């Protein structure tokens, strides 16, 4: 067996052994060891060995003490980890049935804006939320302790939308405005405005980072959807098929598809991974302008399996949803067929979001309510939170999930992303967020200039 010691280290070890054997009168063993290790009496005599007499014992005692300290430290570390798990925020409670959790009442109210809040976005790693307002500013909040971290100024008209994205340059915040521009803010450099993207000819109503890449999509009243490279700021692709204001866009979690919708009352699904965007379907059915859209996570597929065509594989944008001024929400399959219509709101549907567990769809409206629709019960409204705001509710977002690092047991925040466009039916339940823990936190913004934060609390007995 080859030694891991250098020749010098091996010689020093042999000298220590000789000194130990000599000091303890083990003459026969000493003679045998000298012969085996090639250390004759004239090379390392008793006088020289005296200098090494206690070296072996000291090293052994030192290593033993170090090992005891290491074991004690590991035990203390385990105790601290158990204490941390017992005191972690309720919204990270592993014992809670997070797939069935629904909001009950706001635990935080963030107030500082001087005009309507038009948009919100959660930071993918930290307990931060960005909000954009008609007061021309973007504000960054710590939603856990309700503190205003900073205010970003730069837009000259109302801020219409914000979104965080994890890019090769780090985490960026994108904002768009009625001033026709898009701004990129570097979150790692005090939110410095690093780029301003110009190319739209009218109000830019929505921005969304495309997962698994350095792309940003934007939608505008100029009837265009533009894809941008956020590293160099160049326009990559332009979609010009809409015949009215494009109000909202939503990418699939694998970055292969983009959903767009707006005032022309159409829903369009684009394959944006192609060299030129390919329209997979154009659907109609709403009776008024469409204000919002969302792509369902793969975790929703099993709850809507009876509505989907049976085939060997599916795409990441198998199910999509839209909300309209006609007060309804519609769900669509990947062919543009309406598979479900949800009615119950008394006014415009402003924003929608799928529960990460896939079972529910949440919506907010100008009727000041948040509604929760159970997709496993034909879209029945199972919960309605009245007067969630003191005015129209304009936006709704669910916090990104937490990816567990199984190598060391630590938790890190992760976007929902997947590399393949074609997904085997047997893998659908795994694809939504593989290895990702759902966080029971969501937020809404309204014309009352407030952000409401909803989260699972320790005393929540009922999830619905």
From Swiss-Prot:
Sorted keywords for this record are: Cell cycle, Cell division, Coiled coil, Cytoplasm, Cytoskeleton, Microtubule, Mitosis, Repeat, Transport, WD repeat
GO CC terms: COPI vesicle coat; microtubule; microtubule associated complex; spindle pole
Please tell me where this protein is predominantly located: cytoplasm
Query: InterPro entries in the record, alphabetically?
Result: Coatomer_complex_subunit, Dynein_regulator_LIS1, G-protein_beta_WD-40_rep, LIS1_N, LisH, PAC1-like_LisH-like_dom, WD40/YVTN_repeat-like_dom_sf, WD40_repeat_CS
Enumerate the spans annotated as LisH domain.
9-41
The protein's matches in Gene3D superfamilies, at most eight in alphabetical order, are given as: 1.20.960.30, YVTN repeat-like/Quinoprotein amine dehydrogenase (2.130.10.10)
Q: Does the keyword Transport apply?
A: yes
* One example GO MF annotation: dynein complex binding
Entry keyword annotation includes Transport: yes
Any one Pfam family match given in the protein's UniProt record, by short name: LisH_PAC1
User: What is the superkingdom listed in this entry's lineage?
Assistant: Eukaryota
Its localization reads: Cytoplasm, Cytoskeleton; Cytoplasm, Cytoskeleton, Spindle pole
Q: Which residues form a coiled coil?
A: 63-88
Q: Which biological process, per GO, is one annotated for this protein?
A: retrograde vesicle-mediated transport, Golgi to endoplasmic reticulum
Q: Could you tell me which residues the WD repeats occupy?
A: 112-151, 154-195, 199-238, 241-280, 285-343, 344-383, 388-424, 426-464
Kindly list the cysteine pairs connected by disulfide bridges. none
Assembly with partners or alone? Self-associates. Interacts with nudE and dynein.
For this chain, the family text in UniProt reads: Belongs to the WD repeat LIS1/nudF family.
What does the UniProt entry state concerning the protein's domains? Dimerization mediated by the LisH domain may be required to activate dynein.
Q: What does this protein do?
A: Positively regulates the activity of the minus-end directed microtubule motor protein dynein. May enhance dynein-mediated microtubule sliding by targeting dynein to the microtubule plus end. Required for nuclear migration during vegetative growth as well as development. Required for retrograde early endosome (EE) transport from the hyphal tip. Required for localization of dynein to the mitotic spindle poles. Recruits additional proteins to the dynein complex at SPBs.
Q: What is this protein called?
A: Nuclear distribution protein nudF 2
- Highest classification ranks of the organism: Eukaryota, Fungi, Dikarya, Ascomycota, Pezizomycotina
């Amino acid at each position: 067996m080859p030694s891991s010691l250098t020749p010098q280290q091996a010689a020093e070890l042999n000298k220590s052994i000789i000194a130990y054997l000599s000091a303890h009168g083990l003459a026969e063993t000493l003679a045998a060891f000298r012969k085996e290790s090639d250390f004759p009496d004239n090379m390392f005599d008793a006088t020289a060995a005296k200098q090494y007499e206690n070296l072996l014992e000291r090293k052994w005692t030192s290593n033993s003490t170090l090992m005891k300290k290491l074991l004690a430290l590991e035990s203390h570390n385990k105790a601290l980890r158990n204490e941390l798990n017992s005191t972690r925020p309720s919204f990270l409670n592993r014992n809670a049935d997070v797939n069935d959790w629904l909001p009950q009442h706001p635990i935080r109210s963030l107030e500082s804006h001087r005009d309507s809040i038009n948009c919100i976005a959660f930071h993918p790693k930290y307990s931060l939320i960005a909000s954009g307002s008609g007061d021309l500013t973007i504000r960054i909040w710590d939603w856990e302790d309700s503190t205003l971290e900073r205010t970003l100024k730069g837009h000259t008209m109302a801020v219409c939308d914000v979104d965080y994205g994890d890019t090769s340059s780090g985490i960026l915040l994108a904002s768009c405005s009625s001033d026709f521009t898009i701004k990129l803010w570097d979150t790692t450099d005090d939110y410095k405005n690093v780029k301003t993207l110009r190319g739209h000819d009218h109000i830019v109503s929505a921005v969304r980072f495309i997962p698994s890449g350095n792309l940003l999509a934007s939608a505008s009243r100029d009837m265009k959807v533009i894809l941008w490279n956020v590293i160099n700021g160049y326009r990559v692709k332009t979609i010009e098929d809409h015949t009215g204001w494009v109000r909202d866009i939503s990418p699939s979690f694998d970055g292969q598809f983009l959903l767009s919708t707006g005032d022309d009352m159409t829903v369009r699904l684009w394959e944006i991974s192609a060299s030129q965007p390919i329209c997979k379907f154009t659907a109609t059915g709403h009776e008024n302008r469409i204000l919002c859209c969302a792509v369902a996570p793969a975790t929703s597929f099993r709850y809507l399996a009876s509505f989907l065509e049976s085939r060997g594989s599916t795409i990441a944008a198998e199910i999509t949803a839209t909300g309209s001024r006609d007060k309804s929400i519609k769900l669509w399959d990947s062919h543009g067929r309406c598979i479900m219509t949800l009615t119950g709101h008394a006014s415009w549907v402003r924003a929608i979001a799928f529960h990460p567990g896939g079972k529910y769809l949440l919506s907010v409206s100008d009727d000041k309510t948040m509604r929760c629709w159970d997709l496993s019960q034909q879209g029945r409204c199972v919960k309605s939170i009245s007067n969630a705001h003191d005015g129209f509710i304009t936006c709704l977002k669910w916090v990104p999930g937490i990816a567990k690092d199984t190598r060391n047991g630590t938790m890190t925040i992760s976007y929902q992303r997947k590399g393949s466009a074609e997904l085997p039916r047997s893998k659908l339940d795994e694809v939504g967020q593989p290895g990702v823990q759902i966080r029971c936190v969501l937020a809404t913004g309204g014309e009352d200039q407030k952000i409401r934060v909803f989260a699972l609390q320790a005393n929540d007995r009922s999830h619905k």
